[in-house]
């Protein structure tokens, strides 16, 4: 992988990971559109670590409170501070972990197809639009219970299908549960932390077990670029959220689906 390729793929991962437009779809499509070799599991690990560090740093105060209050709640045997929300994040992560363990091989083979990506891109554009237009309410992060977390977690499990978008699916689920835009989005960002860490761990174990060659410079560049672009994307996503809602991403998904259809069918 050359230097320019590492930069471009790092930018794509950083921008798309936390926007409801599907990072996996873009990373799968780039080699198809450009003729580049697949970036491989090592590069995937690097950019996942970059985006993971970005979301932890951006929400460092919230993450610290969730983690510390979660530990305090264990000692106190009751909810303390933000511990209820923290445990909701943990509970919400379980469905995607189970689905990943059971279905990852099938997802990485049978579902990594342009037709699948086009279908999920359109379907979840419509659902995102419906959630933003009709379903969002006034519930906040403090109103999220374990039932809500499981429902959002199931949406995150569905998002393992390429083209769906993890953030898009979880934000949509949050909106349909009556969360306001900011709360649905922030809960989605919080849930990204454990699932991204789990994905990075799986990729690391794969590299170790299969003795995959490591392009340290390319991985470092991709990781740094994905970190910088991800933290920028999070900032502007939240800044523009109330002004524009989800419609820019709905429109982008529909345009992307049309372009892909014209290119491949």
From Swiss-Prot:
GO terms for cellular component: plasma membrane. It is a multi-pass membrane protein. Keywords: Antibiotic resistance, Cell inner membrane, Cell membrane, Cell shape, Cell wall biogenesis/degradation, Hydrolase, Membrane, Peptidoglycan synthesis, Transmembrane, Transmembrane helix. GO terms for molecular function: undecaprenyl-diphosphatase activity. Its EC number is 3.6.1.27. The chain crosses the membrane at residues 1-21, 39-59, 87-107, 110-130, 144-164, 187-207, 217-237, 244-264. Pfam families: BacA (PF02673). It is an enzyme of class 3 (hydrolase). One of its GO terms (biological process) is response to antibiotic. It is found in: Cell inner membrane. Catalyzes the dephosphorylation of undecaprenyl diphosphate (UPP). Confers resistance to bacitracin. Bacitracin is thought to be involved in the inhibition of peptidoglycan synthesis by sequestering undecaprenyl diphosphate, thereby reducing the pool of lipid carrier available. This is Undecaprenyl-diphosphatase. It comes from Idiomarina loihiensis (strain ATCC BAA-735 / DSM 15497 / L2-TR).
